[in-house]
């Protein structure tokens, strides 16, 4: 397995956000399934990925990658999870640079009721994380 992909799986397994500091390039761009405009930079991408880990991989979600397609410096990871009883099917499309750092992370989600649930839960989690970050 590619070292970058292995590190991504380690982040998911350990839920250790410090792994993202080494895994994400400073110029990384995150493409949300909800927000049209790309989110640019390491800090905002890290915030989104931590929120997604809590929402998609939280208790009773049964988050699982069901397929991986690896070609050169690109990984396509299909996943399933359950959020509030709604089955979510999605794809993480990840591109890394020559140093193995993630430079692009795009998430696609289906069906519509799953998108609506992801929108709701990610909005709540992002607000919660922003409030926690703002505390002394």
Predicted regions and their residues:
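Short N-terminal micro-motifs specific to bacterial/archaeal maturation
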Residues: 10-11, 35-36, 93
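A beta-strand edge to alpha-helix "cap/lid" segment located at domain peripheries
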Residues: 53-136
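Short acidic-aromatic low-complexity motifs
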Residues: 1-26
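Soluble or luminal CAZymes and related metallo-dependent hydrolases
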Residues: 3, 44, 86
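Exposed alpha-helical structural elements
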Residues: 7, 19, 44, 114-117, ...
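A solvent-exposed, acidic/Ser-Thr-rich amphipathic alpha-helical stretch
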Residues: 18, 26-71
């Amino acid at each position: 397995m590619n070292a970058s992909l292995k590190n991504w799986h380690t982040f998911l397994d350990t839920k250790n956000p410090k792994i993202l500091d080494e895994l994400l390039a400073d110029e990384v761009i995150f493409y949300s399934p909800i927000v049209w405009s790309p989110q640019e930079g390491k800090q905002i991408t890290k915030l989104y990925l931590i929120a997604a880990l809590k929402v998609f991989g939280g208790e009773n979600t049964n988050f699982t990658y069901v397929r991986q397609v690896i070609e050169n410096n690109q990984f396509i990871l299909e996943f399933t999870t359950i959020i509030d009883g709604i089955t979510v099917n999605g794809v993480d499309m990840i591109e890394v640079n020559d140093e193995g750092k993630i430079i692009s992370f795009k998430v696609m989600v289906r069906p519509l009721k799953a998108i609506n649930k992801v929108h709701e839960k990610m909005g709540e989690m992002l607000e919660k994380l922003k409030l926690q970050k703002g505390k002394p």
